[in-house]
A protein has these predicted regions:
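ATP-binding N-terminal substructure of ATP-dependent carboxylate-amine bond-forming enzymes
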Residues: 1-106
């Protein structure tokens, strides 16, 4: 099964639909965010296979450890996205550090 890590899946609030469709298409949808799990939209909770709460998405080390945990538990990460312009550089760094080749432009 393919693994999709979604950074900050709770923002904007309608992104749970993206997670739902990924899950409906057979992917493990693994969320990383700084919002407590109990405060997530119920639709988002149902759309995620697992959620890892970090203290701050600004802390690269915390987010890195979250991706490492998912890699250990679920195997290779196939996609990593936030779909949020603010996190694009962070997404790219994580893709590089975890050798994630799918979901990025090849030059």
């Amino acid at each position: 099964m393919k693994n999709f890590v979604f950074i900050s899946p709770n923002f904007p609030t309608n992104y749970w639909q993206f997670c739902r469709e990924l899950k409906n298409n057979g992917l493990n949808v693994l969320g990383i965010g700084d919002q407590p799990y109990d405060e997530l939209n119920p639709n988002l909770k149902d759309s995620l296979n697992e959620y890892y709460k970090v203290g701050s998405l600004e802390n690269y080390d915390e987010v890195y450890r979250a991706v490492a945990f998912f890699t250990f538990k679920y195997g290779r990460i196939d996609w990593l996205e936030s779909n949020n312009e603010y996190w694009l550089e962070r997404d790219a760094m994580l893709r590089t550090d975890f050798h994630i080749k799918i979901g990025r432009a090849h030059v």
